[in-house]
Amino acid sequence: DALNRQRLLDAQTFIRDELAQEGIPFAEIEQRLVPVPGDENEVDVFINVTEGQRVTVAQVQFSGNESGGDDDLRGAMGIKREGFWWFRGGSFNEIDYDSDLESNIPALYRSQGFLDAEVVSDTVVVDPTTGKARLEITLQEGQQYRLNSFSVSGNSEFEEEEFSSLFTSGEGGVLSSLGLGGGESTNVEGNIFDVEAFNGAISQALEWYRNEGYLYAEINPVITRLESEDGSSPMVDAAWEVQEGPLALINRVSIVGNDFTHEWVIRNQLTVIPGDVYSQDRLIRSYQSVSSLGFFETPMPFPDIEPTESGDVDITFEVAE
């Protein structure tokens, strides 16, 4: 093949990533191009890898975490300290560590009302003799926000009272930590605003819409900050802006790949019928029923949903015998 230096760099990146997954994040990789004797247009490629010490996490230290202890933060991380038992190896994985810094730790803080929390610096200190590492993470929490109000706009299929079942404390809704729908929501101090739960409940609300045929529904979360004027905790007004979109009907249901099984055997398992309003729940149950026949390779690919020009959908079930 023609020499491609980008492919050589990609090979080094692949090797480095694979070693990092095994707890060897600081490998040295050297590349050499050696001319082939007697052929000036060819070279042999040699990649020399010096793995270095396998790194395990011995300590994880935090600073700047004024609102809570280290244990909660460690529990939110994918990186774990080495333990006494064999299944707590504590290997250092750079990809997981980056995910902890950029996602897992900030998500924990956002669930506790700290909307601006961030990791401002980190250091990995490795003992070159033992390979044991100490992770030093510095945090800036920012202010803790509480909930002032919640509202929904653009909704006609579901009333705002119906949405409240998602976050009424007494009903164990997805947003129960917000305290909405009950007396606690009118508390002067407000409830701590769990933005992770607030955003997560959107998936449940969209599932409602998809089960009623609103396949194209969208919900835009809006968080408006209300700064404190008297030294009390700052608050937020939280809202969902709903765009329900058109109602989608099922135009056509096709089955492909059934070379031996009669089509009616499969269609008897389907609860999605042409002319019906689209329902995500019925589509999933149909998929599960066909899979459970035992005639086809598993896992089956999920049915393909193809929108038509009119906004309706064609559904295709693909099976392999």
Residue ranges and their predicted role:
Residues 1-321:
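Periplasmic polypeptide-binding modules associated with outer-membrane biogenesis and secretion
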